[in-house]
A protein has these predicted regions:
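A short, glycine/small-residue-rich beta-strand->loop->alpha-helix junction that serves as a flexible
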Residues: 51-63, 209, 323-325
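Histidine-anchored nucleotide/phosphate-binding helix
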Residues: 57-80, 221, 333-346
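A donor-sugar binding/catalytic signature common to diverse glycosyltransferases
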Residues: 216, 394-441
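Conserved nucleotide-sugar donor-interacting segment of glycosyltransferase catalytic cores
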Residues: 191-246
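Nucleotide-activated donor-binding/catalytic signature segment of Leloir-type glycosyltransferases, i.e.
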Residues: 372-392
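Leloir-type glycosyltransferase catalytic cores
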Residues: 252-299, 439-488
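Conserved N-terminal ligand/cofactor-binding loop architecture of enzyme catalytic domains
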Residues: 1-48, 70-189, 236-292
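Conserved catalytic-core segment of nucleotide-activated headgroup transferases in glycan assembly
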Residues: 280-378
């Protein structure tokens, strides 16, 4: 079998699963269309997600579709706002592999036709605004970021999408970055006009969009909110095949947890079962398994650790992750926080700091172009005797590391909540979603962060408030099983 034949043979199962999946979706869509009976006089709900899938149905795309089916079967009219070559460039077709390639619009449209069989659809097709295009001509990246048009900060609206596509926070002033800004702003402006027309026509009672941060959904969210229309955003939950829906910011994962919510024995047991799997590395999120295996700390590490008074692990994030705009409150970005932390590390030679890169930082097909490994190399961090760096492809148990630590430092990673749950003191540099509750230490300024870190490092013992661990358990359970909806 030659290379071409082998390639075709390997693709057959993928093609088979793809078309079997489409057949199932089409069958279900027809059944829903046959059984859905809209309540007379009820206002519709608009669904829009242009940043969840292209040729294959993603989990977020499925969550949106299933939610729309549920509403239709309950008698609520639904209108799908659907892209049909509606942007000059979209986020999913603008990653590093295909910045300037033609977009796969035909494939995306074909899947939309299957998914929305028998549903009410309002499609939109792109047309460029000449005046806006002229205003955008020749701008630098800095000027794009600050760009406003007709009273709206389009540069800021598309900025998270550009960072996500470029896989970095600190953007370079190069052709691809300028092109993405230009095309995303032109597309966002067009979506706004089309969405305004749809709102005028349908007068919806609510709008449901994917995460609200990628520019197509962000501009739709803003347009609806200007009119006082409730907007629900959705993201993947922490449980497999679960979705988190909120009227706040989905990527910030804000929830309300009352003091009256206490775990029952059955709920405690359910949480323990989840934690047992989590601590073993047996979990997925958005269909991604971050840990193919999880190794214990080896003898060489333990021997090095024995030379120090204490161990403090430092957990980082992926710099372009959609949680970062919410986390960057005290510091401009995660690397600014690491720069500050490095100064603390240098004046505490008695402490072994273990800096851990996020396991998703170098994921195939989504590898970051601005990494913690680069920061470590640039700052000669591994030359420091009291630092061990664990890169993203080393599958060492973070939980064993936490158990051996005096306390832990995180930016805004979810492992901070798990550390609090294990009874450890946790110091956050970024605003994590769980930092809104009494679970961790989150200083409100860079100076306060340095002072808190110094105090924790010098303390002979750390008396963690008992409420931190109790709240961590309540919060994790609520996030997993109350705030998120199961779609399996």
């Amino acid at each position: 079998m030659n290379r071409v034949q082998r390639s075709i043979w390997e693709r057959i199962p993928i093609w088979r699963d793809k078309y079997l999946n489409r057949w199932r979706i089409w069958q279900l869509a027809r059944k829903v269309a046959g059984q859905a009976k809209p309540t007379p006089g009820e206002k519709p709900v608009i669904f829009f997600n242009a940043s969840t899938r292209l040729d294959y149905m993603s989990q977020n795309g499925a969550f949106s579709l299933l939610s729309s089916w549920g509403l239709r079967l309950a008698g609520t009219p639904v209108v799908h706002f659907v892209c049909q070559r509606g942007m000059s460039r979209c986020t999913l077709s603008s990653t590093e592999r295909n910045y300037f390639e033609a977009m796969p619009c035909d494939k995306c449209i074909n899947l939309s036709k299957v998914a929305f069989t028998g549903a009410q659809v309002q499609s939109f097709t792109f047309s460029q605004d000449a005046a806006l295009a002229e205003a955008l001509a020749g701008l630098t990246v800095e000027q794009y970021v600050k760009f406003e048009y007709q009273g709206l900060a389009y540069g800021e609206i598309v900025l998270p999408s550009v960072r996500w596509c470029k896989r970095r926070h600190n953007l370079q002033d190069d052709e691809t970055t300028r092109t993405l800004f230009n095309e995303f702003i032109l597309s966002a402006y067009h979506i706004r006009r089309e969405f305004q027309a749809l709102l005028d026509k349908s007068d919806p009672k609510a709008v449901i969009v994917f995460n609200g941060l990628m520019f197509p959904e962000a501009i739709a969210k803003l347009t609806a909110q200007e009119r006082g229309i409730p907007v629900v955003m959705h993201e993947v939950g922490y449980q497999p095949f679960s979705g988190f829906l909120t009227t706040r910011e989905a990527t910030a994962r804000e929830i309300e947890l009352g003091d009256d919510f206490q775990l029952t024995e059955a709920q405690e047991a359910r949480l323990e079962q989840y934690l047992e799997q989590r601590f073993a590395g047996s979990f997925t999120m958005a269909g991604i398994q971050f840990w193919p295996e999880m190794s214990k700390l080896d003898e060489s590490f333990l021997a090095k650790a024995a030379e120090f008074k204490q161990i403090v692990p430092v957990f980082t994030n992926v710099i372009f992750d959609t949680s970062q705009p919410h986390a960057n409150v005290v510091y401009e970005h995660m690397f600014a926080w690491l720069d500050d932390l490095l100064a603390v590390i240098k004046v505490h030679p008695e402490t072994l700091f273990v800096i851990r890169a996020h396991p998703d930082e170098m994921r195939m097909g989504k590898a970051s172009h601005e990494t913690v490994k680069q920061w470590v190399q640039r700052n000669h961090v591994e030359a420091l005797a009291n630092v061990v760096f664990i890169h993203s492809e080393e599958f060492i148990s973070s939980y064993e590391l936490i158990q051996r630590s005096k306390f832990m430092i995180v930016y805004n990673s979810s492992i901070g909540l798990e550390g609090a749950l294990l009874g450890k003191a946790v110091l956050c540099g970024g605003e994590a979603w769980y930092a809104h509750f009494p679970t961790v230490y989150f200083p409100k300024s860079a100076a306060a962060f340095r002072q808190q870190a110094d105090a924790l490092l010098k303390a002979e013992q750390i008396a963690v408030p008992k409420e931190f661990q109790r709240n961590a358990r309540r919060l994790l359970y609520y996030q997993n099983y109350r705030a998120a909806l199961p779609f399996d």
